[in-house]
Amino acid sequence: MQHPEITKQMIGVVPQEYNLNQFIPIIETMVNIGGYFGLSKKQALSKTQELFEDLGIWHKRESTPRELSGGMKRRLMIARALIHNPKLLILDEPTAGVDTELRLTMWDFFKKINNDGVTIILTTHYLEEAERLCKNLSIIHHGEVVQNSPMVDIMSSSRKHTYIVRTDSKITDKNIFEENINIIDDKSCELTVDNKTSITEIITKFNQSNINVIDILSKRNKLEELFIELTQK
């Protein structure tokens, strides 16, 4: 690395574990961190207010970290990583342990700063989080990268497709298809077939069993399903 100081200025890191000074007000923490990156106190305070307001913790600015909830500590660490306007933000499990409402709020914030030009590297075990936020995705299995592609390519790579089928009569024969069929109730089922199987073929097979199809809906494959498929290859 030829220019470590310049590189450091370009990167913000949010670790999974809390590493905060528990005994000083969080606004003071932000000013101190800003100083490390060459910001004046005035500049650091201005940026802190902007970040704290965006993250919903401005009203806690005079509190110490030990007085904050887990979700507030998480947001403080995100603000701390952004105090110097980095070009790259590395997030390690940023929404671990937070409730659903806060997770959605944080996702919106990540989308906002990404749209503003910040590149984000996100590590997460929440596959829905990856699907919602990521444009490119790598799946690592036992230390090996088994997939590294744009999200749209990954989501279309599944060899299976799932449909919800509604019929006008009772489904009694699960052997209509060789593929996986899960009976939801008397007149509907969830059917997983090869991607090459057309809707016409599905309807024809039901008709051959004297069952009329009223409706057939595509159920989008979830990233969880694709993850299992990729890691079991």
Protein language model annotation of sequence segments:
Residues V31, G35, K42-K60:
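Conserved ABC ATPase "signature" region
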Residues I78:
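Hydrophobic anchor residue at the start of the ABC signature
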Residues W107-V193:
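ABC transporter nucleotide-binding domain
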Residues T64-L68:
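Conserved ABC ATPase signature
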Residues R159-K233:
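Short, charged/small-residue-rich alpha-helical element at the C-terminal edge
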Residues L89-D92:
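Catalytic Walker B motif of ABC-type/P-loop ATPase nucleotide-binding domains
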Residues N85:
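Conserved catalytic motifs of ABC-family nucleotide-binding domains
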